[in-house]
Amino acid sequence: MKGKFSEFYSSLPNINISDIDNLTLIFDTNIFMYLYLFDEKRQDAFFYNMKQKGFKVFIPYNVGLEYQINRDFQIKNKDVVKQRIDNAFLSIDKVMDETLAAISSFNNNKLKGLIDNINKLKSEISNSTNCFVSDNFDNFKCSNNQDYFDDSIRRRIDDLVHDVGEPYDPKKLEEIYKNGEDRFLKKIPPGFRDSKKGDECYYHDGVEYIKKYGDLIIWMQVLDYLKNCNDGEFVLFVTNDLKSDFWKNINNYKIPHPYLKKEAKSINAEIEFDMMTADEFFNQVMISDLDSNSTEAQNTKDEIKETINVVLSPYESLQERAEQYDRLFSYDDDEMNDRY
């Protein structure tokens, strides 16, 4: 039965990617974006281990384009996340101050002892939270001071990526948009969860890219790459787009949408194709040279989980850009009536 329904099977939960022969990694844009949120130590571990393992890396053209467009936003966004962390803890002081003001307004001497106790509690909480923030989040800002022209992460990404796909011309994009309308109506993945984006678009090099088809464009470029893969090659698509048009949620464990694996297999039946989420991938790469039971390995796993779960919701001057490119960090566990 496995031969007929291979799209429902995966060996990845029991295999370390370092043990896969003839492996090619294809990264979605969000994988590069998350690198900016790790501290310098984790960044170094990622790039060092990727080089040591000799992984072959390919990215579709539109992954590279989205990364270049959003890179400056991500550098700014790291500071925004740190500011949100600071504001969250400052809100504790605000609540305590409001409580004290409300109690003091009664002007009752009997409440003096209570007010003194609240002030003492406020001081203790403030000291405790300040120490916690200092120990855990002070280095959360861009530790290596990336700026637009001096970006160490981009330099290492440039060195890491072996191959970048070619762009689609306007005629090819029009075909994808037309085909995309039909796929979206039939809930064929990927991208139908982005149909609500309407006809918003952006331009690059004189070419119009419609936002709601962003995932589909990248997927078509992945399929184009698969056409020319060698027999026996194992291609792993790594993405943290967790919407239900990429993954199916089974008991809190995400498995690749069977339709995507089936479509990949229909393009090239002589290769192995699978998908992996960002947290699984970063865990395997960043701790590959550590004792899996060590404190350092556990600390790395914890930081990966915290970083992946950071909800990036920029505001003020960054809000417009966030809305324009919100596909980069999209989460959606709501299962729909897919084709499977």
Please report, for each region that a protein language model flagged, where it lies by residue.
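Short beta-strand/turn micro-motifs composed of small residues
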Residues: T239
